[in-house]
């Protein structure tokens, strides 16, 4: 194999790796964001339930217990 051919193969490998990497990152970002939102909602519900059942916390945090 000549130097020009090896360089061409190298460029193709780099280009392919870049394309595959960028598409997989974009796809996983959406899944991670959805999972983060569900986790945040679950944590907020647990905190509300725990705080609102204690009178002192309920009085100090009326914005949480509504």
Swiss-Prot record:
Q: Where in the cell is it found?
A: Secreted
Q: Does Signal show up as a keyword for this record?
A: yes
Lineage: superkingdom: Eukaryota
Effect in UniProt of substituting residue 61 to A:
Gain of selectivity for alpha-3-beta-4 nAChRs. Moderate decrease in ability to inhibit rat alpha-3-beta-2 nAChRs. Small decrease in ability to inhibit rat alpha-3-beta-4 nAChRs. Loss of ability to inhibit rat alpha-7 nAChRs
Assigned keywords, A-Z: Acetylcholine receptor inhibiting toxin, Amidation, Cleavage on pair of basic residues, Disulfide bond, Ion channel impairing toxin, Neurotoxin, Postsynaptic neurotoxin, Secreted, Signal, Toxin
State a single Gene Ontology molecular function. toxin activity
| Main localization category | secreted
Residues annotated as carrying Cysteine amide in the record are 65
**Tissue expression from the record:** Expressed by the venom duct.
- What Pfam families does the record point to? Toxin_8
Propeptide ranges are 22-49
Cystine pairs annotated here are: 51-57, 52-65
Among InterPro entries, the record links this protein to: Conotoxin_a-typ (IPR009958), Conotoxin_a-typ_CS (IPR018072)
Any GO CC annotation of this UniProt entry:
host cell postsynaptic membrane
Sites marked Importance for inhibitory activity towards human alpha-3-beta-4 nAChRs, and essential to the secondary structure: 63
Q: What is the effect of changing residue 63 to A?
A: Loss of ability to inhibit rat alpha-3-beta-2, alpha-3-beta-4, and alpha-7 nAChRs
Q: Region annotation Ser-Xaa-Pro motif, crucial for potent interaction with nAChR: residue ranges? A: 53-55
Q: Which N-terminal residues, if any, form the signal peptide?
A: 1-21
Q: Which family does it belong to?
A: Belongs to the conotoxin A superfamily.
Q: What does this protein do, in the record's words?
A: Alpha-conotoxins act on postsynaptic membranes, they bind to the nicotinic acetylcholine receptors (nAChR) and thus inhibit them. This toxin potently inhibits alpha-3 containing subunit nAChR. It inhibits alpha-3-beta-2/CHRNA3-CHRNB2 (IC(50)=10.7-33 nM (rat)/132.4-704.1 nM (human)) and alpha-3-beta-4/CHRNA3-CHRNB4 (IC(50)=47.3-97 nM (rat)/52.1 nM (human)). It also inhibits alpha-7/CHRNA7 nAChR with IC(50)=103-210 nM (human)/41-61.2 nM (rat) nAChRs. It is more potent on alpha-3-beta-2 receptors in human than in rat, due to a variation (Pro vs Gln) in alpha-3 subunit in these orthologs.
Q: Any other comment in the entry? A: Oligosaccharide chains affect the binding of this toxin at the human alpha-3-beta-4 nAChR through unstable hydrogen bond interactions with His-63 and by affecting the C-loop conformation of the binding sites.
Q: What's in the domain note? A: The cysteine framework is I (CC-C-C). Alpha4/7 pattern.
- Protein name as catalogued: Alpha-conotoxin RegIIA
Q: Which organism is it from?
A: Conus regius (Crown cone)
